[in-house]
């Protein structure tokens, strides 16, 4: 016996037989050990052979285990081949020689076990196996091919192992219905009907429905809705994962693929191969001196012997196919474009029933429309209908979780009962009978209410589940009716459609009526997916608030100016302009093709330009970190403009992406602050033109980043000299006229500095006026209140007098520098001195501390 004359699977079976013998504490390797090992190693092979002979593999496996258990147990010694096993292996080699095979494979061993006198042979014969049946099963398995390689078993029934029959899945009702795409399917049918180069390749963005077209074609073939030359054809979808998985040895992957190709070509045009993600074949299996998988397919594709439908994305087609012209010309392109909103709504309506039956909830039509419209507007990096289907699916899954969970009001009652029971046990120890009786009454009332509501919840849930089960039954009946219609059993079709289905629909109406009666006093279960549910999922995915506004948010938006004035003193015009832009956005009245708003804030330093942007971020998102700040002083060189969108290919930092584009991809709903824009190189403004006009920017990798939900604020100190000069005599009375004249001069300067095409795209340019002394007083109070809150976190109570406010305002008032000197004054005279006093224990931090100003000096004392 030469082990090299055995296939890899046969060698592994022999090795497993040795291990099996050792594990059972036996010495002689008997034919039953070998049969058990062959059944484990060649699972799909023995499944096929036993099925063709009409044997039950499960019962044979059990019987073999019993035979092995009966064998004598011996301790010590190495396992050896028994006389019967040697005879079996010799018979297997003879069978291989007789069949003109180069190697002994698993089917030779099964045949040898059956024809050799041994217990394993008797077991197989008792189960109904005969040599003649096994020989015909082997012939059917091999389809006229001989064993010429050591991985021969991998090539048997290659289509069953490495592909999925889409037509069979369509017959079994396991594919989702395909709605629309008639033009693309018709074009695919035309190409498939050609004599040569009859291989369509579906090219489109991810999620537009390329695979669905192949499934739609399978449905049409099953229904007979195809030209005569394509009737009764089978579509097999190649599973690349199964093809590659377990291919340990060099050339094994190619052998598997060649076996698939041989099986398809051997069917003489009856099988169409669908290869999803076909670009993975280009380069697959390629190693030193070997050709890749695509080259194995080329000859059969060119001759028209192999009909294949490919599917890939535009990027992959460009990357792999266009480089290989020989492969490209063998496929005919079919472009699959993203469907428009109306087509996507039709697709979702067609899929609705499948998702309703899966999640056991109802999906309203307005939810479908919302899924398409909201996904199209807010989820920009993905494509319809895939993103809309995902929204509908997730909203239904979320609702199903709520249906299965205990309602919130019931959960609260249950928690309240537990809390009261704990209180009652505590009061019992104090012998307070009156309180115990009061708690008992309250617990009894709550338990009665809980039982009543729980019963209603359970009844509603049962009715909803009954309705959904009946709908699943109706779907199964429709599938049976379609199958009966294909088979020509029209009596059965009539019985199902006009008898059984009508009966189920009547049952649904009855249960629906019962459910309405139960819910008359109020429903405990929400069973319908609505537009608000879809909007909520969009908000969770993107962070963009598209759900219906609560009353509290409406009030906040209506009084946005007041909220902003709590942090930004003065600058009424700027606050009004920004608040109007935010209100337009949340009311859904903004231009959907542009950002929420774009503003240039001009003014001297320290007047609140950057602070307004920070306040806005905190107010809108409850978090200042939602402010994306780009300091334009870092973009003074010509080449630095690329940092916004990312370095071009070949340059350092290409993989990192752009500072602006990456920030907005992660936080699409945010405030973008370009600080001190006059310091940036003019080329930077060219990058921002399409952001302001179209609300989009393409990064260095070709990804389109959506700016339509951002608020863009640019600040500049341009014209600050003019503002300081004109505003020296600023008073509350002449403020309006002086501001208007100054703004005109600053705008003229701005027009000379920044290009007109950039300025023309800005919504509003606002000049911030220098702060008056009265406003400085308010800022001091604001800063002192901040210090009070900061110390309160450290358990120190702080109060201040009006004299401190007056002192800090006078010391910190400088029209040239705005509010920043105030911060420095408070730091020097208040924070520094207070920290010394607290550390030196000259004031007691456990008692309230008062800050006062006496004779021009800040003093601290305990109240």
Curated annotation (Swiss-Prot):
Q: Any idea which positions bind ATP 2?
A: 603-610
Cellular component GO terms, alphabetical: cytoplasm
- Which keywords does the record carry? ATP-binding, Chaperone, Coiled coil, Cytoplasm, Nucleotide-binding, Repeat, Stress response
Task: Locate the residues binding ATP 1.
Answer: 204-211
Q: Where is this region: Linker?
A: 339-543
Q: Looking at the Swiss-Prot or TrEMBL record, what is one Pfam family this protein matches?
A: AAA_2
Task: Using the UniProt annotation, give all residue ranges assigned to the region (Repeat 2).
Answer: 81-144
List the residue ranges of the region (C-terminal).
771-863
The record, for Gene3D superfamilies, names:
1.10.8.60, Clp, N-terminal domain (1.10.1780.10), P-loop containing nucleotide triphosphate hydrolases (3.40.50.300)
Q: Residue ranges of region Repeat 1?
A: 6-71
Q: Where does it localize?
A: Cytoplasm
Provide the assembly information: Homohexamer. The oligomerization is ATP-dependent.
- What the record says about its domains? The Clp repeat (R) domain probably functions as a substrate-discriminating domain, recruiting aggregated proteins to the ClpB hexamer and/or stabilizing bound proteins. The NBD2 domain is responsible for oligomerization, whereas the NBD1 domain stabilizes the hexamer probably in an ATP-dependent manner. The movement of the coiled-coil domain is essential for ClpB ability to rescue proteins from an aggregated state, probably by pulling apart large aggregated proteins, which are bound between the coiled-coils motifs of adjacent ClpB subunits in the functional hexamer.
- Report the function annotation for this chain: Part of a stress-induced multi-chaperone system, it is involved in the recovery of the cell from heat-induced damage, in cooperation with DnaK, DnaJ and GrpE. Acts before DnaK, in the processing of protein aggregates. Protein binding stimulates the ATPase activity; ATP hydrolysis unfolds the denatured protein aggregates, which probably helps expose new hydrophobic binding sites on the surface of ClpB-bound aggregates, contributing to the solubilization and refolding of denatured protein aggregates by DnaK.
List the NCBIfam families. chaperone_ClpB
Give the protein's recorded name. Chaperone protein ClpB
* Species for this entry: Porphyromonas gingivalis (strain ATCC BAA-308 / W83)
């Amino acid at each position: 016996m030469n082990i090299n004359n055995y296939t890899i699977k046969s060698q592994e079976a022999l090795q497993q037989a040795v291990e099996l013998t050792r594990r059972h504490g036996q010495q002689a390797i008997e034919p039953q050990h070998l049969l058990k090992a062959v059944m484990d190693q060649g699972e799909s092979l023995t499944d096929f052979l036993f099925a063709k002979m009409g044997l039950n593999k499960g019962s044979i496996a059990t019987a073999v285990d019993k035979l092995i258990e009966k064998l004598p147990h011996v301790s010590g010694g190495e396992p050896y081949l028994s006389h019967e096993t040697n005879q079996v292996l010799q018979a297997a080699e003879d069978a291989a020689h007789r069949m003109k095979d180069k190697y002994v494979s698993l089917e030779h061993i099964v045949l040898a076990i059956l024809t050799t006198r041994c217990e394993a042979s008797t077991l197989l014969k008792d189960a109904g196996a005969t040599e003649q049946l096994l020989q015909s099963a082997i012939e059917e398995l091999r389809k006229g091919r001989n064993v010429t390689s050591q991985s021969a078993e991998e090539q048997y029934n290659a289509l069953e192992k490495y592909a999925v029959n889409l037509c069979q899945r369509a017959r079994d009702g396991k594919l989702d219905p395909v709605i629309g795409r008639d033009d693309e399917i018709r074009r695919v049918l035309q190409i498939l009907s050609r004599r040569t180069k009859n291989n369509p390749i579906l090219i489109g963005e991810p999620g537009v429905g390329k695979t669905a077209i192949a499934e739609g074609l399978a449905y049409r073939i099953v229904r007979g809705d195809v030209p005569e030359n394509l009737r009764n054809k089978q579509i097999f979808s190649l599973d690349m994962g199964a093809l590659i998985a377990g291919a340990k040895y060099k050339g094994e992957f190619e052998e598997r693929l060649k076996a698939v190709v041989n099986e398809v070509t051997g069917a003489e045009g009856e099988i169409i191969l669908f290869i999803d993600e076909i670009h993975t074949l280009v380069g697959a299996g390629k190693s030193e001196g070997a050709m890749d998988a695509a080259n194995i397919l080329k000859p059969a594709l060119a001759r028209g012997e192999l009909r294949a439908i490919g599917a890939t994305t535009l990027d992959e087609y460009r990357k792999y196919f266009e480089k290989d012209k020989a492969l490209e010309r063998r496929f005919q392109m079919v472009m699959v474009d993203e469907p428009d909103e109306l087509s996507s709504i039709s697709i979702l309506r067609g899929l609705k029933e499948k998702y309703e039956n899966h999640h056991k909830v109802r999906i309203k039509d307005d939810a479908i429309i919302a899924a398409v419209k909201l996904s199209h507007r807010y989820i920009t990096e993905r494509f319809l209908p895939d993103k809309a289907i995902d929204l509908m699916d997730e909203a239904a899954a979320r609702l199903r979780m709520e249906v299965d969970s205990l309602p919130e009001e019931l959960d609260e009652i249950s928690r309240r009962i537990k809390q009261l029971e704990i209180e009652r046990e505590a009061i019992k120890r104090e012998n307070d009978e009156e309180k115990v009786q009061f708690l008992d009454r309250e617990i009894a009332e709550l338990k009665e209410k809980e039982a009543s509501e729980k019963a209603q919840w359970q009844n509603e849930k049962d009715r909803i589940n009954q309705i959904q089960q009946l709908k699943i039954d109706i779907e199964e009946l429709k599938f049976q009716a379609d199958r009966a219609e294909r088979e020509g059993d029209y009596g059965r079709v009539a019985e199902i459609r006009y008898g059984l289905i009508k009966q189920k629909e009547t049952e649904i109406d009855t249960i629906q009526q019962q459910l309405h009666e139960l819910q008359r006093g109020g429903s405990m279960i929400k069973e319908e997916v609505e537009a608000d549910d879809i909007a909520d999922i969009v908000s969770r995915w993107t962070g963009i608030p598209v759900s219906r506004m609560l009353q509290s948010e409406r009030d906040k938006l209506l009084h946005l100016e007041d909220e902003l004035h709590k942090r930004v003193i003065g600058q009424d015009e700027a606050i009004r302009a920004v608040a109007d832009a935010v209100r337009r956005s949340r009311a859904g009245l903004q231009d959907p093709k542009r950002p929420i708003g774009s503003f240039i804030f001009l003014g001297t330093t320290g007047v609140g330009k950057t602070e307004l942007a920070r306040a806005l971020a905190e107010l809108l998102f409850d978090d200042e970190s939602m402010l994306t700040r780009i300091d334009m002083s870092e973009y003074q060189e010509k080449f630095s403009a690329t940092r916004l969108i990312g370095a071009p290919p070949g340059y350092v930092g290409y993989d990192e992406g752009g500072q602006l584009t990456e920030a907005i991809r992660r936080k699409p709903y945010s405030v973008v602050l370009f600080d001190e824009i006059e310091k940036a190189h003019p080329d930077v403004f060219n990058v921002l033109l399409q952001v302001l006009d179209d609300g989009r920017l393409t990064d260095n990798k070709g990804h389109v980043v959506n700016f339509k939900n951002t608020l863009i604020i640019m600040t500049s100190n341009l014209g600050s000299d003019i503002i300081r000069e004109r505003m020296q005599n600023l008073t509350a009375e002449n403020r309006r006229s002086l501001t208007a004249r100054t703004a005109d001069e600053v705008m003229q300067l701005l027009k000379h500095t920044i290009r007109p095409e950039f300025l023309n795209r800005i919504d509003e340019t606002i000049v911030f006026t220098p702060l008056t002394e009265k406003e400085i007083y308010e800022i001091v109070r604001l800063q002192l209140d901040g210090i009070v809150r900061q110390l309160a976190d450290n358990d120190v109570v702080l109060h201040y007098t009006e004299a401190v406010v007056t002192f800090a305002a006078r010391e910190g008032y400088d029209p040239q520098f705005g509010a920043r000197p105030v911060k420095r004054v408070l730091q020097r005279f208040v924070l520094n001195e207070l920290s010394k006093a607290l550390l030196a224990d000259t004031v007691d931090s456990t008692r309230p501390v008062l800050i006062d100003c006496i004779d021009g000096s800040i003093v601290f004392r305990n109240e």
